[in-house]
Amino acid sequence: MAARGVIAPVGESLRYAEYLQPSAKRPDADVDQQGLVRSLIAVGLGVAAFAFAGRYAFRIWKPLEQVITETAKKISTPSLSSYYKGGFEKKMSRREAGLILGVSPSAGKAKIRTAHRRVMILNHPDKGGSPYVAAKINEAKDLLETTTKH
């Protein structure tokens, strides 16, 4: 072991670095400090860039928030209003049958059959449609055809 105040050989200085005198410098100490300084500068620049980006985002967010909400209101209102919002009634009425097939309740038999064919092609159970919805479509067609005079 190296005694206090005595500089040990090179191999021993690495093993017992804590016993070196405070004034004695290791040859690789400058390289470590330069790397540490560079790392600290890089971290500082990264934090500054992040802060500027956050500041810019907060400034631009208020006007964008208003534009986004207005656009969402414009998109959702007209495009979704044409769809019927609600389930099926217990006993089907002519109005509901017309809504299901997409025709007027007073439409003729030819128009009802055409609408039924078009809707059933889209909702047929063999093509992945729901059997319940297909039954309601058929029920709507039967109801409208039995009450139509033409």
From Swiss-Prot:
The chain crosses the membrane at residues 35-57. Keywords: Chaperone, Membrane, Mitochondrion, Mitochondrion inner membrane, Phosphoprotein, Protein transport, Translocation, Transmembrane, Transmembrane helix, Transport. It is found in: Mitochondrion inner membrane. Gene3D superfamilies: DnaJ domain. Residues 1-34 are mitochondrial intermembrane. It is a single-pass membrane protein. GO terms for molecular function: ATPase activator activity. It comes from the Eukaryota. Its main location: mitochondrion. GO terms for cellular component: PAM complex, Tim23 associated import motor. The modification Phosphoserine is found at S104. Residues 58-150 are mitochondrial matrix. GO terms for biological process: cellular response to starvation; mitochondrial electron transport, NADH to ubiquinone; negative regulation of mitochondrial electron transport, NADH to ubiquinone; negative regulation of protein-containing complex assembly; protein import into mitochondrial matrix; protein-containing complex assembly; regulation of lipid metabolic process. Residues 96-150 form the J domain. Negative regulator of the mitochondrial respiratory chain. Prevents mitochondrial hyperpolarization state and restricts mitochondrial generation of ATP. Acts as an import component of the TIM23 translocase complex. Stimulates the ATPase activity of HSPA9. Interacts with the TIM23 complex. Directly interacts with PAM16/MAGMAS; this interaction counteracts DNAJC15-dependent stimulation of HSPA9 ATPase activity. Associates with complex I of the mitochondrial electron transfer chain; this interaction may interfere with the formation of supercomplexes that facilitate the transfer of electrons between complexes. This is DnaJ homolog subfamily C member 15.
